[in-house]
Amino acid sequence: MAFIADQVAQGRAVESICRVLREQGCQVAARTYREWRRPSRPVADRIVTDAQVQDAVRDAAWATSPDGVRRLAPEGLYGRRKMTAHLRRTALPQASAGAVDRAMRTLGLAGVRRGKTLRTTVPGKDGTRAGDLLDRNFTAPAPNRVWVSDFTYVRTWAGFAYVAFIADVFAQKIVAWHAATTKTTDLVMTPLRMAIWQRSREDRAVEPGQLISHSDAGSQYTALRFTEHLALEGIAPSIGSVGDAYDNALMESVIGLFKTECVRTTVFHAGPYKAVSDVEYATAGWVDWWNNRRLHGTLGMITPNEAEEAHYAALIPQEQPV
C-alpha cells in the first residue's frame, strides 16, 4: 500500500497502478487502496457499551473454581431484570435493560424457569389443627412476627431426602432448614429449634406472644410434640386448609425456587445427588446465596439480610443536631 501511495503522490492514477500490479501477480484493487487510505471511523457508542455489558454479564454469570474449571455461578440463574439490577449494584451503575438483554442472548443466558411441584405433605388425620391466622396475608410489620414452614423431597441414589424450611415473612429470609431421610416430626422440629437459636444468636430473640408459625395441614405440623413446643416458646400456631397450596403460598414459592435454582441445576452441586449429605451441601450453599446475595424483586432488588438490616437501622434513634 505504501508503494501505491508513493506512485499516487507522483501523479499516477490509482487504477493504472493497480492494473500494472495485477499484471505482475500482485492482486490489489483500487477500492482496497482507497479503503486503506480512508480515515478510520469512530466506533459507535452502543457497540462499546454492549461490549462492556457483555463482559460484565459474563463475569457475573460464570465463576472459575479452584481447579480452573469455568462453571455457572448463582447469578447466572438470573433473568434479564435481576441481571440488570445486579450489574447496576456491582459493576455498571448505568447498565440498560436492553444492553443486558442483548448480552444475555449473545451468551446464551435466559434465566431459570419454574417447573411443576409435587405434593409431599400428608394431612394429619388425628392431630388437632389450629386455625388459619394469616388468611393468605403473607406480610409482616417486622421480623419475628410471622414464620412460614414446609418441606419438600429430593431424589438421591440412596432414596428420597426431605428438606424442611422456615422462612420469615417480613423479608423472606430462610431462618432455618434441615435435611433428613425420613419425614417424621423431627424433620420439622429440628429447624424450629434451630430458628429460635439462630435468632437469639443474632441478638434478635423471639419474643413470646409476638410470633405466628404458619404451615400446611401436614401431620408433622399437627403432631402433639410440635404444637407443644410452639406453646412452650410462646409461638402461636397457624394451619392452612387441607389441599390448598395458596394458604401457604409464600413457602410454596420458596420451595419452588429451591427446586428450580438448586436441585435442578449444577450451580450448587456438581453431579447427581448420591446421599442426603450431598443434598445438605447443596442446600447450605443455596440458602447462603438466598439470604446474602440473591436479589428479590418483592424486596426492591435487595437481599433478605439487607432488608432486615435496613429495618433495624431505621429503629435506631438518629442523633439530632445541637
What are these regions, as identified by a protein language model?
Residues 1-322:
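Charged DNA-binding/catalytic regions of mobile-element recombinases
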